[in-house]
Amino acid sequence: MTQQFYVSPEQLMKDRADFARKGIARGRSVVVISCEEGIALVAENPSPSLHKIGEIYDKIAFAAVGKYNEFESLRQAGVRYADVRGYSYDREDVTARGLASVYAQSLGAVFTAEQKPFEVELAVAEVGGNQSDDHLYRLTFDGSIADEKRFIVMGGQADKVAETVEGGWQQELNFAGAIRLAMKGLVTDKEAGELPASALEVAVLDRASESTRGSRRAFRRLGDDEIAALLSKEN
């Protein structure tokens, strides 16, 4: 007769959490920084096509670490949610807080009910009219949600990267300064003094997109040449 093994709910949840954390720890870090000109999103990502950063809606962006297929499915679901809500109600009704709540419900349901949890950590960012109106939300594998201030760091070396970003963050940072600060954090654990532009994925949420580009869409992805030029600028 086969012996049945009992696993307590506490142990089951702990095992699931440990499993998810190990998967996330293998991922390269992502930094999201609120600055004077908007919000900068910087990821260590040598792939030119498998993006860890993406646009969700007019002033909302998404960043993630972990398993690509899992966070990409969440990004696509977020885009569909935003499009439907904006069409059904009003574009102003699509907010980072609403999207983060939807993600939290999905992650929490998978963590408790499915065979395995998602090995992902997410950031949802919304740029405001001024820096105090920016919204940064961090979501973990179990559906926990945190309203962060100034910056978010995710990934395997998050603590070390966050220490560097914390020490260099200033309210007056422009995009160039924020991107350089993020890169400085990302190379904290590396022998090389800097990462090449081709190893970085960078996007911004431009606070002044309507006045400078005549567009509600604040999200803009930077190419290698523009990243290299920004990294060489004096703040």
UniProtKB/Swiss-Prot annotation:
GO terms for cellular component: cytoplasm; proteasome core complex, alpha-subunit complex. SUPFAM superfamilies: N-terminal nucleophile aminohydrolases (Ntn hydrolases). Pathway: Protein degradation; proteasomal Pup-dependent pathway. The formation of the proteasomal ATPase ARC-20S proteasome complex, likely via the docking of the C-termini of ARC into the intersubunit pockets in the alpha-rings, may trigger opening of the gate for substrate entry. Interconversion between the open-gate and close-gate conformations leads to a dynamic regulation of the 20S proteasome proteolysis activity. Transmembrane segments: none annotated. Keywords: Cytoplasm, Proteasome. GO terms for biological process: modification-dependent protein catabolic process; proteasomal protein catabolic process. Pfam families: Proteasome. The 20S proteasome core is composed of 14 alpha and 14 beta subunits that assemble into four stacked heptameric rings, resulting in a barrel-shaped structure. The two inner rings, each composed of seven catalytic beta subunits, are sandwiched by two outer rings, each composed of seven alpha subunits. The catalytic chamber with the active sites is on the inside of the barrel. Has a gated structure, the ends of the cylinder being occluded by the N-termini of the alpha-subunits. Is capped by the proteasome-associated ATPase, ARC. This is Proteasome subunit alpha. The lineage of its organism: Bacteria, Bacillati, Actinomycetota, Actinomycetes, Micrococcales. The gene is prcA.
